[in-house]
């Protein structure tokens, strides 16, 4: 029984699904997808639970969310192993994901009050009050790269605001989704407040097409995000938050501290086997001897990165990709760029055929025409050389995406110029592109999102503002508007 609807664990009536470890092919989870009727049932349960949940005092909702945080801490080792085994990422990195989930609770509570709490301004004849109200029933679509943390970034603020939810994890990480929901169950969520439906494309389409949804919160690919945007077009009454990845540039202007610059590049491009939406996909390196030396050092160090299993000892820097198919897609993207005229600096290599273990690849594309503007979700780094900083900014902005952008330079003025001219929601200076803070908004422009950033700003799309002018008494103004006559006439 792998669906949780209205407080009950039930068996899906849709397609049978099996999840294996992407490296060892060990079977980890088996279950059935939710069919359209069960998706509708989950929505009905969420709708029925909404009035009571929304009327709960905020402190009552907060108490349940904080109990969930306590359970995350108590089961950190178990959840870490589930995430690591299911995604293929190393244990150390899965542990950081669970830590991020725990930290998200306190941050979301602070963000609720800062962004969407209640504010009152005293007026001469009363008060002006700003309150926030939950939307109602929201669908949450989770990704596979951070199957615990990223859905958590929608679920926690949405519950705090008083919404009820239907959560569909990625079909590639059903085990993590189920494990997290079981902790929410133990935290004491009332029946119907949070519902779990497992499944792939058909389940997702059934969920996103429900008439009774009040909104949808999505993290995933641009292609799916655009599809959801088209599907919900003409429905302005529904809130839609899309986080859709990027084709992110990292500019290496000054690599005087060469090993530090190489380390930052590795962290930007290859952490999580290149499966972070903020990962550097395009490396822009200044022409000249220093740039040549930097690239040689990068290729040297990156060539020594050996992906490993989640539980290897010592731990590897990177593990496997989410699937053997994902690894194959990266290989095909590399070969395509070679065919266009790219010069391979470091060839990606499958460690073992049929698994998702893949070594990093680096290819130079300076002067190559018609390079696809796409997010290749894996450890493949494209290199361009540039002559001057204005050209670097032009290259950085030469994408339909706009999630993250970074600069390695000792010149503050160059960073200030980049802040003014970059088209990206995250612009870092001498910090990895993959570094982000939950105390700041997380999101992008262009094809990277629809201006609904998450993290600190997630509270914004989880509630709507209600403005009130209030007075405990009704009084006639001392000064009336022109043309109004309230004098009493004597009866004739």
Curated annotation (Swiss-Prot):
Keywords: Arginine metabolism, NAD, Oxidoreductase. One of its GO terms (biological process) is arginine catabolic process to glutamate. Pfam families: Aldedh. InterPro entries: Ald_DH/histidinol_DH, Ald_DH_C, Ald_DH_CS_CYS, Ald_DH_CS_GLU, Ald_DH_N, Aldehyde_DH_dom, SuccinylGlu_semiald_DH_AstD. CDD domains: ALDH_SGSD_AstD. The active site is at residues 243, 277. GO terms for molecular function: succinylglutamate-semialdehyde dehydrogenase activity. NAD(+) binds at residues 220-225. NCBIfam families: arg_catab_astD (TIGR03240), PRK09457.1 (NF006992). HAMAP family: Aldedh_AstD. This is N-succinylglutamate 5-semialdehyde dehydrogenase. The gene is astD.
């Amino acid at each position: 029984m792998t669906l949780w609807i209205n407080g009950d664990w039930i068996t899906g009536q849709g397609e049978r699904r099996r999840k294996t470890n992407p490296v060892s092919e060990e079977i980890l989870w088996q279950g059935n997808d939710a069919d359209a009727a069960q998706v509708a049932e989950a929505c009905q349960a969420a709708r029925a639970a909404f009035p009571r949940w929304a009327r709960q005092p905020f402190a009552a909702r907060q108490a349940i969310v904080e109990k969930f945080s306590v359970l995350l801490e108590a089961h950190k080792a178990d959840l870490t192993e589930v995430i690591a085994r299911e995604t293929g990422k190393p244990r150390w990195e899965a542990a950081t994901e669970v830590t991020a989930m725990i930290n998200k609770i306190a941050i979301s509570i602070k963000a609720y009050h800062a962004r969407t709490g209640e504010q009152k301004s005293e007026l001469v004849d009363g008060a002006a009050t700003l309150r926030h109200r939950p939307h109602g029933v929201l669908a949450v679509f989770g990704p596979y790269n951070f199957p615990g943390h990223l859905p958590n970034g929608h679920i926690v603020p949405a519950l705090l605001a008083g919404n009820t939810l239907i959560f569909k994890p990625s079909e590639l990480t059903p085990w993590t989704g189920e494990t997290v929901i079981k902790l929410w169950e133990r935290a004491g969520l009332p029946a119907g407040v949070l519902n779990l439906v497992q499944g792939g494309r058909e389940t997702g389409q059934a969920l996103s097409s429900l008439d009774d949804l009040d909104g949808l919160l999505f993290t995933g690919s641009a292609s799916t995000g655009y599809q959801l945007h088209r599907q919900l077009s003409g429905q302005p009454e529904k809130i839609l938050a899309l986080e859709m990845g990027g084709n992110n540039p990292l500019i290496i202007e000054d690599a005087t501290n060469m090993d530090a610059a190489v380390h930052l590049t590795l962290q930007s491009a290859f952490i999580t086997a290149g499966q972070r939406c903020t990962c550097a996909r395009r490396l822009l390196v200044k022409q000249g001897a220093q740039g040549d030396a930097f690239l040689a050092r990068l290729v040297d160090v990156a060539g020594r990165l050996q992906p490993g299993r989640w539980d290897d000892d010592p731990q590897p820097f990177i593990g496997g990709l989410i699937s053997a198919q994902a690894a194959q897609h990266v290989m095909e993207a590399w070969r395509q760029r070679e065919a266009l005229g790219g010069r391979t600096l470091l060839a990606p290599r499958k460690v073992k055929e049929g698994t998702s273990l893949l070594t990093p690849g680096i290819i130079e594309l300076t002067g190559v025409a018609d390079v696809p503007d796409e997010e290749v979700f894996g450890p493949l780094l494209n290199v361009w050389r540039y002559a001057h900083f204005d050209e670097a900014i032009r290259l950085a902005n030469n994408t339909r995406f706009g999630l993250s952008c970074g600069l390695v330079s000792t010149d503050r003025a160059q960073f200030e110029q980049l802040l003014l001219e970059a088209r990206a929601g995250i612009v870092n200076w001498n910090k990895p592109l993959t570094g982000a803070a939950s105390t700041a908004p997380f999101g992008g422009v262009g094809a990277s999102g629809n201006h609904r950033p998450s993290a600190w700003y997630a509270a914004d799309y989880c509630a709507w503002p209600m403005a009130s002018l209030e007075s405990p008494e009704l009084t006639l103004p001392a000064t009336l508007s022109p043309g109004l006559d309230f004098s009493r006439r004597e009866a004739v």
